Structure formats: structure tokens, C-alpha cells
Amino acid sequence: MADFNSPIQYLKEDSRDRTSIGSLEYDENADTMIPSFAAGLEEFEPIPDFDPTTSTSLYSQLTHNMEKIAEEEDNNFLHDTREFTSLVPDEADNKPEDDEESGAKPKKKKHLFPKLSSHKSK
């Protein structure tokens, strides 16, 4: 026969991941084992037994909410993208310059730092 006077010890972790020893004590009134740190929770209502209709409706409600959120995110993503079109170069800008092949003089490229290019070394 089990000795209900000696508590059952177990390892528990707190929010800071520190491990300590907890103990289960026998509750003569409820005929169950409760953690010693749960004293005062006599009015605790346990989770009800599995009810397939409730869980199914909760699942369908959750699924509906997830679909709704996904639609909202899609709508937010499809906002006005005109501000980004300036980042895409025009087709004319993508064409290579064939000035030398056509016989035209090649254009001088602008220097990135005009002030620095004006100081020529002697």
C-alpha cells in the first residue's frame, strides 16, 4: 500500500529556468495528489471532458479567423505600389549604348565627383 504521508518529489522549472524540487502531497478530501505550491486552489475548475462538437466549432472558428487574417494581410500587401515603380529602370535605360557602332562620337561620362575631377595633377 502506498504511503500517502511522504510527499512525492519532482523537479520543476520557474520562469528563469531555475530548477527546484517540488512535492506532491496527498489531499484527503479530494482523494487526488496536488502540488504543494497549489494550496488554495480548491475552487479550481478542471478542463471539461472532451466534447467533439465544441472542439470542432472552436477549430472551425480558429480556421475562419486565420483565413480572415490572411486575407487582410493580402489586402495590405496589395497596396498602391506606384512608389516602387521609380526603382525599376525604363526599357530605354536597359539598352546598351551602341554609339561607337553607329559612327557617332562616344559621349563623355560624367565624373562622379566633379569637384575632385577639376583638380588635375600636373
Swiss-Prot record:
Transmembrane segments: none
Membrane in keyword set: no
Record-stated family: Belongs to the asfivirus structural protein p14.5 family.
Key word ATP-binding present: no
Organism: African swine fever virus (isolate Warthog/Namibia/Wart80/1980)
Subunit structure: Interacts with the major capsid protein. Interacts with host IRF3; this interaction interferes with the recruitment of IRF3 to TBK1.
Biased composition (Basic residues): 105-122
CC per GO annotation: virion component
One of the GO BP terms on file: symbiont-mediated suppression of host cytoplasmic pattern recognition receptor signaling pathway via inhibition of IRF3 activity
Keyword terms of this UniProt record: Acetylation, DNA-binding, Host-virus interaction, Inhibition of host innate immune response by virus, Inhibition of host IRF3 by virus, Inhibition of host RLR pathway by virus, Late protein, Viral immunoevasion, Viral release from host cell, Virion
Molecular functions (GO terms): DNA binding
Subcellular localization(s) per the UniProt record: Virion
The protein, known as: Structural protein p14.5
Processing and modification events after translation: Acetylated.
Region of interest called Disordered, as start-end residue ranges on this chain: 1-27, 73-122
Functional note: Structural protein required for transport of intracellular particles from the assembly sites to the plasma membrane. Binds to both ssDNA and dsDNA. Suppressed the activation of the cGAS/STING pathway by interfering with the recruitment of IRF3 to TBK1, which in turn suppresses IRF3 phosphorylation, decreasing interferon production.
